[in-house]
Regions:
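C-terminal partner/receptor-binding element of secreted or periplasmic proteins
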Residues: 126-157
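Soluble non-cytosolic domains of exported or imported proteins
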Residues: 38-43, 60, 135-142
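Compact, glycine-rich, soluble single-domain proteins
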Residues: 49, 53-55, 60-106, 110
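Positively charged n-region of N-terminal signal peptides that target proteins for export
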Residues: 1-4
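N-terminal signal peptide c-region/cleavage motif recognized by signal peptidases
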Residues: 13-18
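Extracytoplasmic/secreted envelope proteins and their assembly/folding machinery
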Residues: 42-45, 49, 66, 145, ...
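Terminal, regulation- and interaction-focused segments at domain boundaries
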Residues: 20-56
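Beta-strand/loop substructures that line and gate deep hydrophobic ligand-binding cavities in soluble
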Residues: 107-134
Length: 157
């Protein structure tokens, strides 16, 4: 089961990027924003984690998929997931749309592509709003976007 989960997460993390704007690269189908990093996966994730802690977020997990893949004798490029949150948006959204729990708490994925380039990816809050159409969620979604943007921008300085 862990092998299937790990492989599925890796496949999802490498979805095609379809649109670029001032906020980064956005895959319009998945709602994932992706930005480049000049650092290694580990260094970038260390900075993402520090930035999340810096705004008072709780760190729930940091998953190193490359390390996990070694346990099943699969060789993958560096790929780490951080699960974090402050608890403001999730309860409201989940109360109104229980399936929103699949997208909460926040997640940031730092990964290396086949060219050795490192990327930071996260879900666009507006996509979450569209997916669940929770009435009155606009302020929560705006907060989600602002918090994640602040964390990623700080990490990529």
């Amino acid at each position: 089961m862990k092998k299937v989960f790990g492989i599925a997460a890796i496949v999802l993390s490498f979805s095609a990027v379809a649109f670029a704007d001032e906020s980064g690269l956005l895959d319009k189908n998945s709602g994932i924003i992706t930005k480049p990093s000049k650092l290694s996966v580990t260094e970038t994730m260390d900075r993402v984690e520090a930035a999340a802690k810096g705004i008072g977020a709780n760190i729930f997990a940091r998953v190193d998929y490359q390390q996990l893949s070694k346990k099943v004798n699969v060789d993958i490029r560096p790929n780490q997931l951080l699960i974090f949150g402050r608890g403001a948006a999730a309860p409201y959204l989940i109360k109104e749309a229980p399936l929103a729990g699949i997208d909460m708490p926040f997640k940031a994925l730092v990964w290396e592509d086949s060219q050795g380039k490192v990327w930071v990816s996260h879900t666009n809050g507006s996509f979450i709003d569209t997916r669940y159409a929770v009435k009155g969620a606009a302020s929560y979604v705006k907060n989600v976007d602002e918090v994640i943007e602040k964390i990623v921008s700080e990490a990529l300085k």
